[in-house]
Each structure stands twice: as structure tokens, then as C-alpha cells.
């Protein structure tokens, strides 16, 4: 796992100088295989959204639970790679963490996921501080994590991959089988449901991984480079899958080097530059900002949206 993390962090930010293993008490795979706990939101008072003021950590917006990072700091040796970074994700929205190589976006994402322990700052789910919780404990609170690397069980069929997680929910068998069929249909996996994990295309694998993650009914999903290793023809397919998750009232945090594909589906985005937040706003605001274009997007960048975003919201079931 440490090797995987090292491969995903930009040059000069390797975790070997300060291993992230201290934050991972259990395999990352458990983040998609542990039933979510009772809703944190049910026991929390009404709170403020991120826009209500910096420094607060009351974690409910008007629309639901908020996953919030405040003042994150990460140092490797004498080098500070993340310095006072703050962002939030509400249920039912898609938020992007963007930036050039070495900007600190991946490290910030890993601190929020539970893969890297910050040297400073706090992470909250609602009013509960989760800064030092490993991935599998965050999963029990309703935070799913999908790594860039393939996480399907390679020698299990698609339906068994999904069912293996459903079986851990403790729900009745009839419910498990009904939920399995619902997820198979929703993610158009009917034709490959009997295929082994190692026989899936990049797009099929991603759909299987997201379907399996939904088996635990998460409140938030962390997507690490969701468009990596996916054929160009399947990119819009994955975008549409992620886009529709917001209609389940799931908050999505994405980090990806494919800025065009990411901005096409995000509601808001944070741009990191040299370890700090340079800009935050809607994709349209980000694409129009001259400083952002100069330091990151270039003048030739054109923001594109997808046709599926104009369709009616899907009906679950």
C-alpha cells in the first residue's frame, strides 16, 4: 500500500520520508467492505455550511452532512507540501481537487481519505473529528474510498464482487439479492455479470467498483483518479455514472489530472498551487479567472459540459 501511495504522489513528495503506513491500521479494501454506521446526521444539530465562515466546524449544511477539511498541513522532512488548505463537500454535490503536479492536491486528498496523517489541521464529518481515523473506520461512518488502482477481486465474478460486500451488511438475504439485481441493472453490468474481475475493461471495472461501493450506502465517496486507465470512449460513461451519484444525495470528492473531464461534472472545484488554495468556485468561475488560466488551464482551455447533464434526474430503483 505504501508503494501505491508513493506512486500516486507527485515527484518530490514521496511518503518514504514519512511513511503513511501509520494511518492505515487495516487494508484499504475494507473501505468498500464495511457496513456504514447509523447516520451521523440524525444525531447532530442544525449547523452552518462552509460559506458561513472560516474556522467553524459545524458539519451540517441546510441540505445535509458536510465533510470538511480545515487548515491542513503536511510536511515531508523540511519541505511543506500542504499549507493551511481548507475545503468542504456537501452531500449531493461533486467537488474537484485540482492542481499541477506538486501542488499538494493528492496529499490533501489522501489526508481527507485517511491514507496520510496530517501534521496540522482537522478533518470533520459533521461535528465528529475524524482526522486520525484510518480508512476502514471512516468507511464505517459512511465515507467510501475508491483508489486509482483496480480494487475489484480479480478472480471473482462481477456479481460476486458486489454480493461479497452486501453479505457484510448483515441485511436479510432477500434484500441482498434484490439490491444486487438493482445495482447490476443501474450500472449496466448485465452482460458482464458472470465475468471475472480480471477480464473487465477499464470502464466495466470502474462501474463494478462504484456499484460495489454503493452496496454499503455511503454518504460520501472519494474518487482517486477515476478517469485513469479508462479508454477515451468510456470516459463519458464514467462521468455519467459519477454525475448520477449526486441524485442519491452522495457527496463526491474527486482528484484527477484530467482537468477537462473533472470540471465537466463538478459543481465546485478547488485549485491548489504550491501547497495552498489558489482559487475556489464553480467550473465556470474557475475557467474564466485570468490567474487560473495563466497558472494552470492556459488560454486555450475551453470548458465543456456533457449532454447527459441536461436530462431529467434518474429515478432510483
What feature does the model see in each segment?
Residues 174-192, 239-243:
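Conserved ABC ATPase "signature" region
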Residues 129-149, 173-177, 283-291:
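ABC ATPase NBD coupling module
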Residues 113:
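Helix-to-loop junction immediately C-terminal to a conserved catalytic motif
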Residues 217:
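Conserved catalytic motifs of ABC-family nucleotide-binding domains
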Residues 196-200, 204:
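Conserved ABC ATPase signature
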Residues 98-100:
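The feature captures the beta-strand-to-loop junction immediately N-terminal to the Walker
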Amino acid at each position: 500500500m505504501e508503494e501505491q501511495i508513493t506512486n500516486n504522489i507527485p515527484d518530490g513528495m514521496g511518503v518514504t520520508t514519512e511513511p503513511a503506513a501509520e494511518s492505515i491500521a487495516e487494508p484499504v479494501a475494507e473501505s468498500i467492505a464495511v457496513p456504514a454506521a447509523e447516520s451521523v446526521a440524525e444525531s447532530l444539530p442544525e449547523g452552518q455550511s462552509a460559506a458561513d465562515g472560516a474556522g467553524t466546524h459545524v458539519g451540517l449544511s441546510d441540505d445535509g452532512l458536510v465533510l470538511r477539511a480545515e487548515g491542513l498541513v503536511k510536511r515531508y522532512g523540511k519541505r511543506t507540501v500542504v499549507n493551511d488548505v481548507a475545503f468542504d463537500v456537501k452531500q449531493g454535490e461533486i467537488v474537484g481537487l485540482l492542481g499541477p503536479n506538486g501542488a499538494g492536491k493528492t496529499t490533501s486528498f489522501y489526508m481527507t481519505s485517511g491514507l496520510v496523517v496530517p501534521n496540522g489541521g482537522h478533518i470533520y464529518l459533521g461535528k465528529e473529528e475524524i482526522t486520525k481515523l484510518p480508512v476502514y473506520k471512516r468507511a464505517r461512518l459512511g465515507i467510501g474510498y475508491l483508489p486509482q488502482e483496480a480494487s475489484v477481486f480479480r478472480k471473482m465474478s462481477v456479481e460476486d464482487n458486489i454480493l461479497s460486500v452486501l453479505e457484510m451488511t448483515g441485511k436479510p438475504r432477500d434484500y441482498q439479492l434484490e439490491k444486487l439485481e438493482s445495482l447490476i441493472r443501474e450500472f449496466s453490468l448485465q452482460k458482464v455479470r458472470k465475468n471475472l474481475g480480471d477480464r473487465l475493461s477499464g470502464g466495466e471495472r470502474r462501474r463494478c467498483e462504484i456499484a460495489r461501493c454503493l452496496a454499503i450506502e455511503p454518504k460520501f465517496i472519494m474518487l482517486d483518479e477515476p478517469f485513469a486507465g479508462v479508454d477515451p470512449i468510456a470516459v463519458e460513461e464514467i462521468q455519467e455514472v459519477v454525475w448520477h451519484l449526486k441524485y442519491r444525495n452522495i457527496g463526491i470528492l474527486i482528484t484527477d489530472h484530467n482537468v477537462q473531464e473533472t470540471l465537466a461534472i463538478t459543481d465546485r472545484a478547488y485549485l491548489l498551487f504550491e501547497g495552498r488554495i489558489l482559487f475556489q468556485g464553480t467550473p465556470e468561475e474557475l475557467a474564466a479567472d485570468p490567474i487560473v488560466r495563466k497558472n494552470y488551464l492556459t488560454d486555450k482551455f475551453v470548458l465543456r459540459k456533457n449532454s447527459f447533464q441536461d436530462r431529467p434526474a434518474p429515478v432510483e430503483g
